[in-house]
């Protein structure tokens, strides 16, 4: 029996989000622990799964704070490294009135992209049922090599491999490079989570179904999840397509972490039910739970520390049905 349900590799950083004005009229920023892979793991922990994180932070105040937050969430940090020369990565998040966001990164370099292949403990990855990664660790040669090593170890050990492109344009030298690296990620995965704007960018097709068909024909990915924000979500499993409406919240603050929460719920369903013989009813059940959980996180600042409990998600579903 494997030690972990899910191991994820990638960025662990501080999301600085706006939190009103000071008495002098200056913008105040709140330091929220973040990073997509750890957000995913935090939600999986809430759902009762055993998880571990592979990554790097700076050997500084913020890095040590992040390590503590991750450990407090129940996530194993045996393969979390500290860099003495480079600081923890920072992201400044500007939130618009509709809840959408714009990012400014302090990451040239940041500690997360200096995780080397030699620092990746293959034994932790091979001791997982599922391995999850995104594209932010593919933006730089050093962490790219670490990611490639981790994916190879996961595939060798028979792990389910899952990928979320999580495109952040400012972090890439060129969008052509981003396309090439995300192409590589899609060739590795059994489950892909992709957003509406990402599928349009990657395939050049405005119609989502046409874009998904291109991905299915090119990469033969068993299960593809499409998140569409306020339009809900879809799941594509071969010829089977399911769709679920969103749970619109009147008190939405921001959308940071919503996609990660959605992704975690999908991975939890896959761990519990496998990737065989999924039908429309099963996929719809999966999407409804994931949509509900994602909607709850939009009512809270940050993500990693405030993931919803299973009971909160089930209560929301019961109230809306």
Predicted segments with their positions:
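Conserved N-terminal subdomain of the carbohydrate kinase-like
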Residues: 50-133, 314-321
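Short, electropositive alpha-helical surface patch
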Residues: 62-75, 180-188, 212-216, 248
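Glycine-rich phosphate/pyrophosphate-binding beta-alpha loops
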Residues: 89, 135-139, 294, 300-303
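Conserved beta-alpha-beta core of the PfkB/ribokinase-like small-molecule kinase fold
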Residues: 139-214, 221, 231-232
């Amino acid at each position: 029996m494997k030690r972990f349900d899910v191991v994820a590799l990638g960025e662990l950083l501080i999301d600085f989000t706006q939190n009103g004005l000071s008495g002098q009229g200056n913008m105040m920023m709140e330091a929220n622990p973040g990073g997509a892979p750890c957000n995913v793991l935090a939600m999986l922990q809430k759902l009762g799964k055993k998880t571990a994180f592979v990554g790097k932070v700076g050997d500084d105040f913020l890095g040590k704070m992040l390590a503590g937050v991750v450990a407090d969430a129940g996530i194993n940090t045996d393969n979390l490294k500290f860099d003495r020369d480079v600081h923890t990565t920072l992201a400044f998040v500007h939130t618009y009135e509709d809840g959408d966001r714009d990012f400014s990164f302090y990451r040239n370099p940041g500690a997360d992209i200096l995780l080397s292949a030699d620092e990746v403990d293959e034994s932790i990855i091979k001791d997982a049922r599922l391995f999850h990664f995104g594209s932010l660790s593919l933006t730089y040669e050093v962490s790219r090599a670490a990611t490639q090593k981790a994916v190879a170890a996961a595939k060798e050990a028979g792990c389910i491999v899952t990928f979320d492109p999580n495109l952040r344009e400012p972090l890439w030298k060129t969008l052509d490079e981003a396309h090439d690296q995300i192409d590589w990620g899609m060739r590795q995965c059994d489950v892909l989570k992709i957003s509406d704007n990402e599928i349009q960018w990657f395939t050049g097709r405005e119609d989502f179904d046409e874009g998904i068909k291109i991905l299915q024909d090119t990469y033969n990915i068993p299960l593809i999840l499409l998140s569409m924000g306020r339009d809900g979500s879809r799941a594509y499993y071969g010829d089977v397509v399911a769709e679920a409406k969103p749970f619109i919240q009147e008190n939405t603050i921001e959308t940071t972490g919503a996609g990660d929460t959605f992704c975690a719920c999908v991975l939890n369903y896959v761990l519990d039910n496998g990737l065989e013989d999924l039908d429309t009813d099963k996929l719809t059940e999966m999407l409804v739970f994931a949509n509900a959980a994602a909607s709850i996180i939009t009512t809270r600042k940050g993500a990693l520390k405030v993931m919803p409990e299973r009971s909160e998600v089930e209560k929301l579903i019961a109230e809306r049905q």
